[in-house]
Amino acid sequence: MCDKEFMWALKNGDLDEVKDYVAKGEDVNRTLEGGRKPLHYAADCGQLEILEFLLLKGADINAPDKHHITPLLSAVYEGHVSCVKLLLSKGADKTVKGPDGLTAFEATDNQAIKALLQ
């Protein structure tokens, strides 16, 4: 399967396309081109429905990418409040530190996200 097409669907919120990839055997925990997992791309781009679907299909909520960034940190860095809320509600580890040595709470100035992380 073509990573670029799958990554495009993840980033752009094409849930039907993502479902098709998974139905055809795409591993929701496979490291894609770029050293990231599907959950990272969805979290980075604020794709809440994609996040929910991938988690339902067994995506590892705390999987680090090649930079040791978790999906929660990805959502925090990009300011996606709804994604942060979902990931926390599903058990994301908020104590993990990013490559800068900061936790998600320490890495954001977004007050809504800080409130969720407290």
UniProtKB/Swiss-Prot annotation:
Promotes dimerization of NF-kappa-B subunits and regulates NF-kappa-B transcription factor activity. Plays a role in the regulation of the growth of actin filaments. Inhibits the activity of the F-actin-capping protein complex formed by the CAPZA1 and CAPZB heterodimer. Promotes growth of cardiomyocytes, but not cardiomyocyte proliferation. Promotes cardiac muscle hypertrophy. Coiled coil: none annotated. The keyword Transcription regulation does not apply. ANK repeats lie at residues 2-30, 34-66, 67-99. Induction: Up-regulated in heart left ventricle of patients with severe coronary artery disease and history of myocardial ischemia. Up-regulated in heart left ventricle of patients with dilated cardiomyopathy. Keywords: Acetylation, ANK repeat, Cytoplasm, Nucleus, Phosphoprotein, Repeat. It comes from the Eukaryota. Interacts with RELA. Interacts with the heterodimer formed by CAPZA1 and CAPZB. The gene is MTPN. GO terms for cellular component: cytoplasm; cytosol; F-actin capping protein complex; nucleus; perinuclear region of cytoplasm. Ubiquitous. One of its GO terms (biological process) is regulation of translation. It is found in: Cytoplasm; Nucleus; Cytoplasm, Perinuclear region. The keyword Nucleus applies. This is Myotrophin. InterPro entries: Ankyrin_rpt (IPR002110), Ankyrin_rpt-contain_sf (IPR036770). It holds the Pfam family Ank_2. Gene3D superfamilies: Ankyrin repeat-containing domain. SMART domains: ANK (SM00248). Belongs to the myotrophin family. The modification N-acetylcysteine is found at C2. The modification N6-acetyllysine is found at K4, K11, K24. The modification Phosphothreonine is found at T31. This protein is produced by a bicistronic gene which also produces the MPD6 protein from a non-overlapping reading frame. MPD6 belongs to a group of cryptic antigens without conventional genomic structure. It is encoded by a cryptic open reading frame located in the 3'-untranslated region of MTPN. Its main location: cytoplasm.
